[in-house]
Protein backbone atom coordinates (compact mmCIF):
# COMPACT_ATOMS: atom_id res chain seq x y z
CA UNK A 1 0.00 0.00 0.00
CA UNK A 2 1.54 3.27 -1.13
CA UNK A 3 0.30 6.24 0.86
CA UNK A 4 1.09 9.88 0.23
CA UNK A 5 2.52 11.96 3.08
CA UNK A 6 -0.88 13.61 3.52
CA UNK A 7 -2.64 10.23 3.75
CA UNK A 8 -0.08 9.07 6.32
CA UNK A 9 -0.69 12.21 8.38
CA UNK A 10 -4.47 11.68 8.28
CA UNK A 11 -4.03 8.08 9.43
CA UNK A 12 -1.74 9.17 12.26
CA UNK A 13 -4.28 11.75 13.48
CA UNK A 14 -7.05 9.16 13.26
CA UNK A 15 -5.02 6.64 15.26
CA UNK A 16 -4.13 9.26 17.88
CA UNK A 17 -7.83 10.14 18.18
CA UNK A 18 -8.72 6.47 18.69
CA UNK A 19 -6.14 6.13 21.48
CA UNK A 20 -7.38 9.37 23.07
CA UNK A 21 -11.02 8.23 22.93
CA UNK A 22 -10.05 4.96 24.63
CA UNK A 23 -8.28 6.88 27.39
CA UNK A 24 -11.25 9.19 27.78
CA UNK A 25 -13.58 6.19 28.08
CA UNK A 26 -11.38 4.91 30.93
CA UNK A 27 -11.68 8.26 32.71
CA UNK A 28 -8.20 9.55 31.85
CA UNK A 29 -8.09 13.29 31.22
CA UNK A 30 -6.83 14.40 27.82
CA UNK A 31 -3.52 16.15 27.23
CA UNK A 32 -2.86 18.73 24.50
CA UNK A 33 -2.09 16.37 21.55
CA UNK A 34 -4.98 14.06 22.45
CA UNK A 35 -7.50 16.91 22.54
CA UNK A 36 -6.24 18.25 19.20
CA UNK A 37 -6.41 14.76 17.66
CA UNK A 38 -10.02 14.12 18.72
CA UNK A 39 -11.27 17.48 17.43
CA UNK A 40 -9.27 17.21 14.19
CA UNK A 41 -10.58 13.71 13.54
CA UNK A 42 -14.14 14.91 14.19
CA UNK A 43 -13.73 17.65 11.58
CA UNK A 44 -12.15 15.36 8.96
CA UNK A 45 -14.85 12.71 9.38
CA UNK A 46 -17.61 15.32 9.38
CA UNK A 47 -16.31 16.70 6.08
CA UNK A 48 -16.32 13.20 4.59
CA UNK A 49 -19.96 12.85 5.67
CA UNK A 50 -20.85 16.04 3.80
CA UNK A 51 -21.32 18.45 6.70
CA UNK A 52 -20.71 22.13 5.94
CA UNK A 53 -17.67 24.16 7.01
CA UNK A 54 -19.85 26.42 9.17
CA UNK A 55 -21.48 23.43 10.85
CA UNK A 56 -18.11 21.84 11.63
CA UNK A 57 -16.71 25.13 12.96
CA UNK A 58 -19.58 25.26 15.45
CA UNK A 59 -19.86 21.55 16.25
CA UNK A 60 -16.09 21.15 16.61
CA UNK A 61 -16.22 23.36 19.70
CA UNK A 62 -18.63 20.94 21.38
CA UNK A 63 -16.65 17.71 20.99
CA UNK A 64 -14.60 18.02 24.19
CA UNK A 65 -15.40 19.77 27.46
CA UNK A 66 -13.02 21.49 29.84
CA UNK A 67 -13.70 18.76 32.45
CA UNK A 68 -12.39 16.08 30.07
CA UNK A 69 -8.96 17.72 29.80
CA UNK A 70 -5.99 18.14 32.09
CA UNK A 71 -5.78 21.45 33.90
CA UNK A 72 -4.76 24.34 31.64
CA UNK A 73 -5.29 22.55 28.32
CA UNK A 74 -8.40 24.54 27.34
CA UNK A 75 -6.50 27.80 27.80
CA UNK A 76 -3.61 26.55 25.65
CA UNK A 77 -5.76 25.88 22.58
CA UNK A 78 -7.17 29.08 21.09
CA UNK A 79 -8.06 27.60 17.71
CA UNK A 80 -7.53 24.48 15.64
CA UNK A 81 -7.14 24.54 11.87
CA UNK A 82 -7.85 21.36 9.94
CA UNK A 83 -7.55 20.82 6.20
CA UNK A 84 -10.44 18.50 5.35
CA UNK A 85 -11.74 16.94 2.15
CA UNK A 86 -15.35 17.84 1.40
CA UNK A 87 -17.44 16.48 -1.49
CA UNK A 88 -16.64 19.68 -3.43
CA UNK A 89 -12.92 19.84 -2.58
CA UNK A 90 -10.42 20.48 0.18
CA UNK A 91 -11.11 23.34 2.60
CA UNK A 92 -9.54 24.76 5.74
CA UNK A 93 -11.80 24.56 8.79
CA UNK A 94 -10.96 26.72 11.82
CA UNK A 95 -12.52 25.85 15.17
CA UNK A 96 -12.21 28.84 17.53
CA UNK A 97 -12.07 28.16 21.29
CA UNK A 98 -12.56 24.42 20.74
CA UNK A 99 -12.68 23.43 24.42
CA UNK A 100 -15.33 25.16 26.51
From Swiss-Prot:
It comes from the Bacteria. One of its GO terms (molecular function) is urease activity. Belongs to the urease gamma subunit family. Its main location: cytoplasm. One of its GO terms (biological process) is urea catabolic process. One of its GO terms (cellular component) is cytoplasm. Keywords: Cytoplasm, Hydrolase. Pathway: Nitrogen metabolism; urea degradation; CO(2) and NH(3) from urea (urease route): step 1/1. Heterotrimer of UreA (gamma), UreB (beta) and UreC (alpha) subunits. Three heterotrimers associate to form the active enzyme. It comes from Rhodobacter capsulatus. It is found in: Cytoplasm. Its EC number is 3.5.1.5. The keyword Hydrolase applies. It catalyses: urea + 2 H2O + H(+) = hydrogencarbonate + 2 NH4(+). This is Urease subunit gamma. The keyword Oxidoreductase does not apply.
Amino acid sequence: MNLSPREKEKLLVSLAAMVARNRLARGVKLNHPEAIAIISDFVVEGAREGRSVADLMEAGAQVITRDQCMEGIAEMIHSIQVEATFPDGTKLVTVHHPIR
